Amino acid sequence: MKISQIEKKKHLYLIKLDNGDNLTVTEDTIIRFMLSKHMVIDSQQWEDIKSFAQFSYGKSKALGFIAFQQRSQKQVQDYLLKHQISPDLIPSIIDSLKQGKWIDDQQYVDTYVRQNSLTGDKGPLLLKQKLMLKGIASQLIEPVLAQTDFSSIAQKTAEKIYQKYQHKLPSKALTDKIIQGLLNKGFSYDLAKGIVSQLSLEQDSQHIEGLLDQEFDKLLRKYSRRYDGYQLKQKLYQALYRKGYDSDDITTKLNDYF
């Protein structure tokens, strides 16, 4: 067999043989086999060229995928499968990328956790969950999390929640909101409680009274359509208590109204 034509197609090359066969290859394939027009090749060489061309194409796709963003090994594997790279070739492509330090799950964890410490708001439980979803083994994740101080991240996250709800909720509900927000972000309950204890959540009575009045009016409109008398009073009390208002304040408000 003889190469009758080598035609460049963007970043790839189309090789045509005189027997009608053709193959799209990477530049690495051209260089590795020193391919040129009129070159004579036998059937075994052609099979070797095709095999390496698939490997090189897969590796090129992977490098494009990780060029601008660090990826985990599983992310790269999934990407290659999605782009119809042969599953038989993927392990060798991954090994080549690992040897070249293009993918390194331990480095991925280190960078991910460090970036969260600088600009993120996630606690260790959520970080671990997200990293494991990227296919990273827990034994690579846990030592890094254990060495990371999450108190400042939790403090910053708690303050953001406080700023958002301080004028909308009474102190008890505000405390619960901050703790739940921290738990949702993956911080431990003990750390969440400790952070909240450091915040100044006291509110003046006039502010609380204003919040209670607003909530009372809203709930009254809702429940007065279906209830009256004692039953209405009970529904209002229960709803206001669930929203974090003090029992004595609720009772006073209800007695004033009824």
Curated annotation (Swiss-Prot):
Subcellular localization(s) per the UniProt record: Cytoplasm
This protein's GO CC annotations: cytoplasm
Primary location class: cytoplasm
Keywords: Cytoplasm
GO-annotated biological processes: regulation of DNA repair
Role: Modulates RecA activity.
Protein family membership: Belongs to the RecX family.
UniProt protein name: Regulatory protein RecX
Species this protein is from: Streptococcus equi subsp. zooepidemicus (strain H70)
